[in-house]
Amino acid sequence: MGKVVLLPEELRNKIAAGEVVERPVSVVKELVENSIDAGATRIIVEFANGGETLISVIDDGEGMTREDAILALNRFATSKIKTEEDLYNIKTLGFRGEALASIASVSKMELRSKTELEDGVFIKVEGGVIKEVNLWQGSKGTVIKVSDLFYNVPARKKFLKSKATETNLIIDFVKRIAIAYPQISFQLIQDGKSKFITPGDGDLENLISLLFDIRVQESLISFQKREGDYCIEGFVSKPGKLIALKSQDYFYVNRRWVRNNTILQAIREGYKGRILDGYFPFSIIFLTVPYSEVDVNVHPTKREVKFQKEKEVYEFVFRSIREALDEEEKKFFINMKAPETESKEYKSDSQITLDREILSLPLEFKPYKSEKKLSEAVSEYIPLRSGFRIVGQIFDNYIILETKDKVYIIDQHAAHERIKYEELKEELNLGYIQNVEILFPVVIEVSEEEKILLDKYKDLLERFAFSWEDFGPYHIRIVKVPYEFLNFDSKSIENLFREIISDISEKDLSKLEDKIIKSMACHSAVRSGNILIREEMEMLIKLIFEKNIPLTCPHGRPYIWEISREDLERYFHRR
């Protein structure tokens, strides 16, 4: 007798259910997507005990006839595709015809459905077996109640996480699907209590204000872009806002919530230099592409998609994000350049000291005393335009700038580092960074491997205005440096050069020039701990205004923090 046998239908359904129904949220996903495909304008999702004991989805969609409802409980029974060609042009969320059969095979299910013109139907199913079929006198739409999930597959229950985890997954999914369809009203009920109801008025911004706290609302940039058959729109976080160590993305392709590395990498590259490595921005992104150019049939849960034109999608998303961030920074500087108040008189040092004594503020407030000049450009000092007032410097690193209704706190090192980075990058693009011969050459010790590396990249480093010569078997003598470092002491020059050696020692040399520019910018910028005079602070702020530079240092740290009068009044409960 042969060893190969056909598995019984009940066992086949349970195996198939393992791919489609991984956990309670899988049930919610499949049922809600069916409701959307049925044209529902209102969907109510209820669950209890993390979805293990109860999941119910009610909609006002087109409903099913008795014949269709019974047929839909069979695998591969669907109204959404009919031919192989349909598989490559899918416009619905569901299409395989597996969901209801898979869910019914591992639970106790009650299905009620009614169309506009025909009588309704009630079907009771246990473990994939139909137990009862009757008439149902309800409203147009569908009601599906799933209870005792995995009651007949106890091994599957063991792999479920805690009730709190399963609950959070369901809440997160309903939020995500509600964002994708703001024109549909969603109600979520957890353990008998309503969590939220969305209005279903199509207003996405209003929906975001309902689902997220005010911190999220105030930190988003809206954008939209169209190129040929591609369209992208949505919201991304402002540089320095809402960043996290894990991805916090809401990606939708043709209104389908997906995970996709192409989109994720394009967004991260768009934020490059505006966010720290290893961190993620907040994003809600709707990408529309021709249905024929996206394959949604690459994963059992349909969460992953594959693009026919991967490179074009990547470049389109990257450009869109970069342009949105550039535009936001332009707006920021335009708003800063046009305050609505007249310039205030600066207080003298003695007046500020008196104010400190009266208020007894616990701040290291050092107005306008200098230990190191910001730039030789201070000698060409031009006062700030009217409407701005530099309050002073705190903690030897932060400049406080005031306008009529806002306060700006500026990290002097990070801001100057960005300025130097942009200047050096521009000089390198023009093909010339000015160098200068130093009076006392700096001798540093190097290993044999480092000497080989320096010889290999000698031409590149000379483009950055460094020049050196051998000084024995294990030493080199630096004789020329960029003009920016003329007045640096030997230890500072050695530290910079060692950092550059570290840059060229890394295996990934694809972005070597950028790494070297970042190192040079960091070392040439005014340091944290340098006390600045007023003219130096004003010169730094003027350079920020004039260059319209990104609002982060080259490594992605924000250098400016805007606090509105409204924010302060809200904090002190004045509004």
Swiss-Prot record:
Disulfide bonds: none annotated. One of its GO terms (molecular function) is ATP binding. GO terms for biological process: mismatch repair. Keywords: DNA damage, DNA repair. InterPro entries: DNA_mismatch_repair_CS, DNA_mismatch_repair_MutL, DNA_mismatch_S5_2-like, HATPase_C_sf, MutL/Mlh/PMS, MutL/Mlh/Pms-like, MutL_C, MutL_C_dimsub. Signal peptide: none annotated. It comes from the Bacteria. Pfam families: DNA_mis_repair, HATPase_c_3, MutL_C. GO terms for cellular component: mismatch repair complex. This protein is involved in the repair of mismatches in DNA. It is required for dam-dependent methyl-directed DNA mismatch repair. May act as a 'molecular matchmaker', a protein that promotes the formation of a stable complex between two or more DNA-binding proteins in an ATP-dependent manner without itself being part of a final effector complex. Belongs to the DNA mismatch repair MutL/HexB family. NCBIfam families: mutl. This is DNA mismatch repair protein MutL. It comes from Dictyoglomus thermophilum (strain ATCC 35947 / DSM 3960 / H-6-12). The lineage of its organism: Bacteria, Pseudomonadati, Dictyoglomota, Dictyoglomia, Dictyoglomales.
